[in-house]
C-alpha cells in the first residue's frame, strides 16, 4: 500500500500603506506592483505561507507559526522562500516528495495572470519538482468579504505528498 499524504493550508494578510513611494506585494517570491503592501512580520507572502502550512499539515508537523514565530526578531522580514525550503527539508527528511500542489489566491487586485509562470517556477525550484506539478490560480470573491473590499489577500494550498522512491 502506498502511503500518500494530503495537506491543506490557508493564509491571509491585510493590505497596508508602508509609507514608501513604491508599493508591492510578494507572492510566491515574485514582487508584484500594487497600490499597497502587505502587513506582516515576514514578507507577507500568502502563497508560500499557505503552501508551507499545507506541507507541514500533511505530515502533522504543526504550522509555520510554530516553526517561525512572529515573536522571534530573527523572522522579521523573512524571505518566505527560505521558510518554504526549510519546510520542504522536513518533508524530504520524513521520506516524502511533492506529488503536486494546487494553490488558489483570492483577491480583486493585483491581477496575477501576468505573473503566473514566474510564481510557479519559483515554487517548482524551491520544491525540487517540475513546474507541471505546481498550479497557481487566482480568483476574485465578486467584491464580497474582506478580499472583495480590497482589505487583504488570501491563499489556499493543497498538496499531495508521495513516498520518495529514489531515497534521495
UniProtKB/Swiss-Prot annotation:
Residues carrying the site annotation Transition state stabilizer: 41, 140
Annotated keywords: Isoprene biosynthesis, Lyase, Metal-binding
Record-linked InterPro entries: MECDP_synthase (IPR003526), MECDP_synthase_CS (IPR020555), MECDP_synthase_sf (IPR036571)
Co-factor remark: Binds 1 divalent metal cation per subunit.
Stored Pfam families: YgbB
SUPFAM superfamilies hit by this protein: IpsF-like
Co-factor(s): a divalent metal cation
NCBIfam families in the cross-refs: ispF
PANTHER family: 2-C-METHYL-D-ERYTHRITOL 2,4-CYCLODIPHOSPHATE SYNTHASE, CHLOROPLASTIC (PTHR43181:SF1)
Protein name listed in UniProt: 2-C-methyl-D-erythritol 2,4-cyclodiphosphate synthase
Organism this protein belongs to: Psychrobacter cryohalolentis (strain ATCC BAA-1226 / DSM 17306 / VKM B-2378 / K5)
Species lineage: Bacteria, Pseudomonadati, Pseudomonadota, Gammaproteobacteria, Moraxellales
Amino acid at each position: 500500500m502506498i502511503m500518500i499524504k494530503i495537506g491543506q493550508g490557508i493564509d491571509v494578510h491585510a493590505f497596508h500603506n508602508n509609507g514608501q513611494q513604491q508599493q508591492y506585494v510578494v507572492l510566491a517570491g515574485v514582487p508584484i506592483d500594487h497600490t499597497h503592501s502587505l502587513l506582516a512580520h515576514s514578507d507577507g507572502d500568502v502563497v508560500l505561507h499557505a503552501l508551507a502550512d499545507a506541507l507541514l499539515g500533511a505530515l502533522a508537523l504543526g504550522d509555520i507559526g510554530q516553526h517561525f514565530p512572529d515573536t522571534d526578531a530573527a523572522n522579521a522580514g523573512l524571505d518566505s522562500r527560505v521558510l518554504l525550503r526549510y519546510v520542504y527539508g522536513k518533508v524530504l527528511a520524513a521520506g516524502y516528495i511533492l506529488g503536486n500542489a494546487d494553490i488558489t489566491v483570492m483577491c480583486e487586485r493585483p491581477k496575477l495572470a501576468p505573473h503566473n509562470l514566474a510564481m510557479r517556477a519559483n515554487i517548482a525550484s524551491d520544491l525540487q519538482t517540475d513546474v507541471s506539478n505546481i498550479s497557481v490560480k487566482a480568483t476574485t470573491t465578486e467584491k464580497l468579504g474582506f478580499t472583495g473590499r480590497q482589505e487583504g489577500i488570501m491563499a489556499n494550498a493543497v498538496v499531495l505528498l508521495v513516498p520518495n522512491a529514489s531515497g534521495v
